[in-house]
């Protein structure tokens, strides 16, 4: 009886340790994944500073719309729009 109780408690303790270790790895993985996503988001913010995206307010005399996306600053509406026909 004492031996079976000892084995049962030892088994529960071992199960607790294994579950705790796997949970820690999952939390670490999710934190690492979140950090990498935020790092990518920070990099894209740097690109946004260089040029303005679609629908952003702009100044026609100082066109800062993204030329790589075929965007130009509309003189009439003063926002970045797609240039059609080029």
Swiss-Prot record:
Against Pfam families, the record matches this protein to: Toxin_12 (PF07740)
Residues annotated as carrying Isoleucine amide in the record are 84
Q: What is its main location?
A: secreted
Outcome when changing residue 76 to A: Important reduction in activity, without change of toxin conformation
Where is the chain membrane-spanning? none
Where is the site described as Interacts with channel found in this chain? 76, 78
Instruction: Report, as the record phrases it, the tissue specificity of this protein.
Output: Expressed by the venom gland.
Cellular location of this protein?
Secreted
**Which GO molecular-function terms appear in the entry?**
ion channel inhibitor activity; sodium channel regulator activity; toxin activity
Cystine bridges: which residues? Answer: 51-66, 58-73, 65-80
Q: Please report the propeptide residues according to the UniProt annotation.
A: 22-49
Q: Where is the signal peptide?
A: 1-21
Assembly information from the UniProt record: Monomer.
Function according to Swiss-Prot or TrEMBL = Neurotoxin. Selectively blocks neuronal tetrodotoxin-sensitive voltage-gated sodium channels (Nav) with an IC(50) of 44.6 nM. Does not affect tetrodotoxin-resistant voltage-gated sodium channels or calcium channels.
Which family does the similarity line name? Belongs to the neurotoxin 10 (Hwtx-1) family. 22 (Htx-4) subfamily.
The domain-related comment in the record is:
The presence of a 'disulfide through disulfide knot' structurally defines this protein as a knottin.
The miscellaneous comment for this protein is: Several genes are coding for Mu-theraphotoxin-Hhn1b for which the structure by NMR has been determined. The cross-references to PDB can be found in entry AC D2Y232.
**What is this protein called in UniProt?**
Mu-theraphotoxin-Hhn1b 3
């Amino acid at each position: 009886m004492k031996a079976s109780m000892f084995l049962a408690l030892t088994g529960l303790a071992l199960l607790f340790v294994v579950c705790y270790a796997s949970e820690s790895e999952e939390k670490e993985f999710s934190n690492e994944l979140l950090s990498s996503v935020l790092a990518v988001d920070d990099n894209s913010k740097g690109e946004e500073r260089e040029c303005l995206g679609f629908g952003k307010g702009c100044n026609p005399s100082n066109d800062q719309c993204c030329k790589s996306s075929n965007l130009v600053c509309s003189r009439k509406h003063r926002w970045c729009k797609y240039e059609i026909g080029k």
